[in-house]
Regions:
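N-terminal pre-ligand scaffold of iron-sulfur
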Residues: 1-63, 93-118
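Short cysteine clusters
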Residues: 49, 68-71
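Short cysteine/histidine-rich metal-coordination sites, predominantly Zn2+-binding motifs
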Residues: 63-69, 82-91
Length: 118
């Protein structure tokens, strides 16, 4: 599959998150947290906190971070990297494209994190 409709721009105010149930090319369901940052940009990440089985779409959005409501782990929605313990594993991030009013997400093309060698 390619890009899929996750929501409409008008469905989300800045600083909010919502769950989108999408389907990958194999037919598997993929739960995605669509995030609209405080500055109005859209991001898509795997919905499940990597510390526990908790929906990140139910978390608080502050800037480009979403905080898991259960244990306080925070993730940078641009990279998926955890910003606060107890989570240490990043969440998947997915490409987002805005087409007019439509927020499109491609769950078959997760972004990869480029880390610099220390």
């Amino acid at each position: 599959m390619a890009e899929q409709l996750a929501c409409l721009v008008s469905d989300m105010e800045p600083g909010t998150a919502r769950l989108a149930e999408l389907t990958d090319a194999s037919g598997a369901n993929v739960a995605v947290a669509v995030i609209r940052s405080d500055d109005g940009d859209f991001y898509a990440i795997g919905d499940e906190c990597t510390h526990g089985e908790v929906s990140l779409a139910e978390g608080d959005v502050k800037g480009c971070l979403v905080e898991c409501w259960a244990h306080g782990s925070r993730f940078d929605v641009r990279t998926g990297e955890p910003d606060e313990f107890p989570a240490i594993t990043p969440v998947k991030t997915y490409p987002v494209r805005i087409d007019g009013e439509r927020v499109l997400v491609d769950v078959d093309a997760p972004k990869t994190i480029q880390k610099e060698n220390a």
